Amino acid sequence: AAALQRLREVFDIEELPPDVLPHKKPPQFMVDLFNKVADANGITRAPGLLEGDVVRSFEDRVRVDQYHFYFDISAMEKGEQMLKAEFRVFKLKRTHAFRRSDVKHFCRVEVYELLESGSKPQKKHLIASRLLSLYTEGWEVFNVTQTVSKWVANSNSNHGFLITTTHVFNSRTEHNLVKFAKSQGVLQDSRNALLVLFTNSNKRRSSSFVPSSTSKFTQEHASVSRRPRAASVPSSKSQVTACHRRELYVDFRAIGWSGWIIYPNGYNAFYCRGSCLFPLGESLNATNHATVQSIVHTLKLSQAVSTPCCVPDELKSLNLLYFDDKENVVLKTYKDMVATRCGCH
């Protein structure tokens, strides 16, 4: 129990989310973003591709009004710094053409911040405006960073967005001119509107989960399996004990987290094992300090000096795509989670 609690701290999970998989599907945008940022094992492909280390997606909560969109962003953590906010709506293709030949094929779409709830006429503030074709369909993305920053600072100011459509030909506002995809009932629409926040967690996460071979966690065998085949283990018998990297697979299903972690199913943290005896070869990636320490130990110049330690000296980040405790989908990057190289230090 203590080991699993420690693991939750490493992954910055305060409350375990409910099991929502497989009946609830994540937004395709978030799945595509994960695949762009990480490989199938969650390891970062290209550092710096994302703004910040957390991407949060919130689905539209308004079912009845075709043009009103509301997002509950209360899952944002204290101290989290928002870098960018995107309002993503899927514009549906108009199926019926106008009978009059002189009607133009474009309309103006305007996005407003609602300043009050339920007031008539609606008090609103214009955020963005653009021309769109009536007969095309696809995602429209609006930068709403300034507005959402205000909502984060004061949650009471969040009354959602309103979209209006104005026909360019005669400047008459027609609310049914263009429709946007809305989730209907229990069945989730893959094209449902999203509010996507790119943030920095501003947390110095506790020491990453790359345990040594003698750690308490691995001794308890708490949902971590060491695969028998070592990764890049030296072949000759004289080198077997030298510092090297071995596999250490963290299985989220075995831990009991597979009901809310979307990707990956688990990951290979790897760990370092072996001795750092003099002479330290180039393959041991030894520091100058470690080299001197191994010499002092070998010459027995000091009884108190031990051999250098075999530890990770190169680490990569891990990406998790998961449902939080309010069933919002989050993509989070965790630094220094995978040992890619071992050395004597």
Task: Give short role names for the model-derived ranges.
Residues 1-345:
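Secreted, disulfide-rich extracellular signaling modules
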